[in-house]
Amino acid sequence: MMPRKEAKRIDIALQGGGAHGAFTWGVLDRLLDDDRLEIVGVSGTSAGAMNATALIQGLASGGRAAAQALLRDFWSQVSAAARLSPIQRTFFDMLAGRWSLDLSPSFVVSQQLQRMFSPYQLNLLDINPLRDIVAAFYDFDIVNRAEDHKLFLSATNVRTGLPKVFRQPEISADALMASACLPFLFRAVEIDGEAYWDGGYMGNPPLFPLIDETDVRDTVIIQINPFERRELPKTAYEIENRLNEITFNASLIKELRAAYFLAEIIRHEGLEREAYRDARLHRIEAQQEMRKFSVSSKLNAEWPFLEHLH
C-alpha cells in the first residue's frame, strides 16, 4: 500500500465582485472537497473578504465541512435580504433568462441619483442591510483566535489613498464593512479615527501579505473581474462598466508584476530564500463565462443566479 502523500499547503487570495463572489464560493467548495490541499492563509477584498472570513471561521471551528456549510449559509442570507431590495430584474429579463439589472427602472434611477447625490445626502440613516448580516453571522472571536490560519482583509484609506490590510486579531464587523464599502452607495466606514472605502481600489485581492507573512510558496488567486473584453464599449453605460472592471483589476495587475520582478531578482541575484521567498502564483478564473454578465448583475443576489455562479 502506497503511503499517503502529505497535503499540499496553499494560500488563497479572493477578489471582490458583489454577487459575483458566489463564483468564488463555488471554487472554495471544490477546493475544500480536495483533501490533497491544506489552506493556510487567506486574503480577500469586499465579497472576497466575506468569503475569506467565513472560510477561516469554518476551518477553525469545524474543519472543511463546517467551512462549506458557513459559506452556503452566508450566501443564502445575502440572497434572502436581497429579496427586499427595490432593485430587481424586470419581468422581460426573467423571461429572456438575463441576469442583468440594466433594464430595471429602479436600478436606472439609482444610477442617476448616485451621479447627483452622495450617500451622505441620500442615505441619511446610513442603512446597509449587509451590516446586519455581517454583525450577526460571523464569530470574530473564533476568526481572530484561528492559530492555524492567517486572514488578511484589504480596505482603502480615504485620507491617505493607501491600502489598509486588517489582520488577526483586528478582524471585526467594521473591518469587513470597510473592505466592502462602495463610496457611491455607502458612507465611509470609520475605524480608530480613519475612514475607509472598498479595498478593491488598492488591493483586489492583496497578495503580498500572503507572500510576506506565511511560509507557503503557492498562492491561488480566485479572479472574478475579467481582464479582457472583446467588444469595444461605445455607450456611456458600457464605458462606465468597463472602467469599473479595469479599476478593480489594476491593483491585482500591479501586484502580479511586482511578484514577477521579485522572482526574477531572486533567480538572477541569488538572494537567500530565507529572506525572499520565490512565490508561485496560480490563478483560477472563468473569464469566458464572467464576460457574459454586466456589472449591474453584481447587485443581483437572487438565489438561482448565485447557484448558477456557484
Predicted regions and their residues:
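Patatin-like phospholipase
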Residues: 1-43, 53-310
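Gly/Ala-rich beta-loop-alpha elbow adjacent to hydrolase catalytic centers
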Residues: 44, 48
